[in-house]
């Protein structure tokens, strides 16, 4: 783009398009079903679509199983517009059930939270049947039967599509740990073979009228930044995400492998970008759902995938488990990067150095997306160096810009504001119209924009820099944007700090304000006293942490840095201190 013709509004200028080849710039999203889309991109029915613990599954099997399961779902009473609660990990049957739900006009409902939250989701769905793994406990089954309309539960053995003996011992151990003392049983339970048999017998019409815009996939946000909400996607919106990435496809000469490990399909990014995208782009999909996150290094070395879905927790384990030899060759890894949460400059430097030390020349990148946007919103295609929140440029059909928080007023380049996106992957909405209206807003340009709640800015080349989640003002002035604060410390290269991150908690003495706490992971032989002066010297006054706390390692919960848990600990300790202080004051008064 000619810089002289720029308006100063990213949504109009779209400067990022210069990084895409001319042939891709008019990319159109197909208006078709997921099944039609996968068949359109299928390299051949005899080609292996998925590998699952020693079992190679051909595309022909995917199509055949989908047909049988669609009829089985109809036999159980599911039909057009119904919600099918599914509590499966990323096993082959998850793919079949998703495609079968589409065929009968229903939608999958996935949730991976507490039992109470899962039961609540099922109750709201009105479903009388749920699908789960056979490690469902009897007390869990009874909870579904008593607190929702569920009458039947279809149970699947995780090894139905593989031989258990083909799993490494540590995978078997992880799988075994999921089984309770008393498994679900009784008249309400239907085994997988019994379920399939019902499909074989069903002789009615299974296929609903095609509607690519009806709900197909429902999942819940993680709740890491607020109350968990149900996000609803259609075949059209999911294809809207996948189609913007699948031009990185396999060829007749080289077919890359892609591993998805540990992560549950109840995370929209896992189902859309982690499973559907590789299937639609001629990659060999390696399903590895029962790998413990602490064993991700072993599975990486066993499968040697060309790429796999990484999150910061996995990278930490790979670097620090101590099982990867100094001379181990990781050159098979052709792409490497993380999503899921912000990644500061110190983390980025550590990861890039680790790759380089192990003969991997891939540039370690950070991505950006959300459940509401269908997962990936950006790609790391610009030559700009990674770091400082750089998450790349908008994907081909997405328009991303920055707006004054709480408004629809678009800001110009390098101005901090709320990140908003408009594109074909946006959710249909939440399960409540009020929340949907707040998140999806039609602007004066006639486009529907998702207001993400994230803060950041865009430069003149269209590179997006994500800085923090929401505003966190400190009493007396200054906004506690966590990533820039962490990067300030990372760039200072303070001797003794291996990793560091901030947790921002409510200031109970000043309503609407917040206080920062700094957590550090130190090198051997160092203490907080050794680094505190340098830490405070490089931070502005409003950034000064209330306390610097040493941890042995970065804590994770539900695949993200456990800021929620640490916040609860801080608030609990603060309340205990105040309670003790009041007790002392009363004693002194007496």
Give short role names for the model-derived ranges:
Residues 1-76, 80, 160-161, 166-184, ...:
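N-lobe entry segment of adenylate-forming
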Residues 105, 239-258, 266-309, 320-323:
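Conserved AMP-binding/adenylation subdomain of ANL enzymes
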Residues 52-56, 69-114, 258-264:
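Conserved AMP-binding/adenylate-forming
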Residues 58-60, 207, 216-243:
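Conserved AMP-binding A3 loop
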Residues 393-397, 409-441, 478-480, 526:
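Conserved ATP/PPi-binding loop(s) of AMP-dependent carboxylate-activating enzymes
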Residues 501-506, 517-521, 531-590:
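Conserved C-terminal "lid"/linker of ANL adenylate-forming enzymes
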Residues 122, 130-135, 423, 428, ...:
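AMP-binding/adenylate-forming catalytic core of the ANL superfamily
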Residues 184-190, 194, 306-309, 322-387, ...:
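Gly/Ser/Thr-rich phosphate-binding loop
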